[in-house]
From Swiss-Prot:
Enzyme kind, highest EC tier: hydrolase
UniProt-annotated catalytic positions: D116 (nucleophile), D118 (proton donor)
Name assigned to this protein: Phosphoserine phosphatase
Record function comment: Catalyzes the dephosphorylation of phosphoserine (P-Ser). Also catalyzes the hydrolysis of phosphothreonine (P-Thr).
Protein's gene: serB
Catalytic activity: O-phospho-L-serine + H2O = L-serine + phosphate; O-phospho-D-serine + H2O = D-serine + phosphate
Family in the record: Belongs to the HAD-like hydrolase superfamily. SerB family.
Organism: Escherichia coli (strain K12)
GO biological process, one term: L-serine biosynthetic process
């Protein structure tokens, strides 16, 4: 292998020759390195030579770059060693994301992704938008925020929020659905996973009216959510049947895995609220997505900056192991 200098390296990290190599400032050293399933990922948009060397300089230690590749407009870099708290903090300060490699399911083996819906698969909390149109928006939004932070019992808080809708016109549901903003990256993520033989489902503490719409639009494998009771075109203020709470979500993941004969090691769960934590912990890979502080603290893997294609960036690490 001829000597490689920092100046020889192109701006596009995925085109770097001589990987694996050690990067320390302007010093570049090709290595004979075989890491197996160990190491960690650093990824983000615009992660070029300059940003990577700036990151390494702040880290204050040499980085062993095992592989680099692109996932659509994201650059993904696989690094040797252990992901430290300092490396994580500096990545977030640089608007980049990280993930340890150890428990990543294999992308080319059939798997299962179970997503939360509100503020994960879509950009809004549906109950808040319904309540705005019903005239109880401010009160309901405050309760929703506290429930997602884990400060309130989810079931009791959901029932209290739904009760404020009593007597409101159920056509509100259609109004909200007509303007339902999908989370960036959702459609691409679902299409890519389904092409690879994965099952994708939603387990939501929100409502069936929206979850079933997403199921049909994206051809999802399954959805579970809460059903609002409607009589004579009006909300009764009640929810029909069992509440989809934190434990229900976790049981949905394990049930679907059993139903489709998918090992738990090949499952992924993603969500943003405290009621997603049991599901996140039950999965082979649990991801907190733009989550509340309590959820970020308790999840081993978080996505702070990327959109939902960040999930695919993480899973792509299973394809780039030497």
């Amino acid at each position: 292998m001829p000597n490689i200098t920092w100046c020889d390296l192109p701006e596009d990290v995925s085109l770097w020759p001589g990987l694996p190599l050690s990067l320390s400032g302007d010093e570049v050293m090709p290595l004979d390195y075989h890491a197996g399933r160990s190491g960690w990922l650093l990824y983000g948009r615009g992660l070029d030579k300059q940003r990577l060397t700036q990151y390494q300089s702040k880290l204050g230690a040499a980085m062993v770059i095992v592989a680099a590749w692109c996932v659509e407009d994201y650059q993904v870099i696989r690094l040797a060693g252990s992901l430290t708290a300092r490396a994580t903090r500096l990545a977030h300060e640089a608007q980049l994301d990280v993930a340890p490699l150890g428990k990543i399911p294999h992308l080319r083996t059939p798997g299962l992704l179970v997503m939360d819906m509100d503020s994960t698969a879509i950009q809004i909390e549906c109950i808040d938008e319904i309540a705005k149109l019903a005239g109880t928006g401010e009160m309901v939004a405050e309760v929703t925020e506290r429930a997602m932070r884990g400060e309130l019992d989810f079931t009791a808080s959901l029932r209290s929020r739904v009760a404020t809708l009593k007597g409101a016109d159920a056509n509100i549901l259609q109004q909200v659905r007509e303007n339902l903003p999908l989370m960036p990256g959702l459609t691409q993520l679902v299409l890519k996973l389904e092409t690879l033989g994965w099952k994708v489902a939603i387990a939501s503490g929100g409502f069936t009216f929206f979850a079933e719409y997403l199921r049909d639009k994206l051809r999802l494998t399954a959805v579970v959510a809460n059903e609002l009771e409607i009589m004579d075109g009006k909300f009764t203020g009640n929810v029909i049947g069992d509440i989809v709470d934190a434990q229900y979500k976790a049981k949905t993941l394990t049930r679907l895995a059993q139903e489709y004969e998918i090992p738990l090691a090949q499952t992924v769960a993603i969500g943003d609220g405290a009621n997603d934590l049991p599901m996140i912990k039950a999965a082979g890979l649990g991801i907190a997505y733009h989550a509340k502080p309590k959820v970020n603290e308790k999840a081993e893997v978080t996505i702070r900056h990327a959109d939902l294609m960040g999930v695919f960036c993480i899973l792509s690490g299973s394809l780039n192991q030497k």
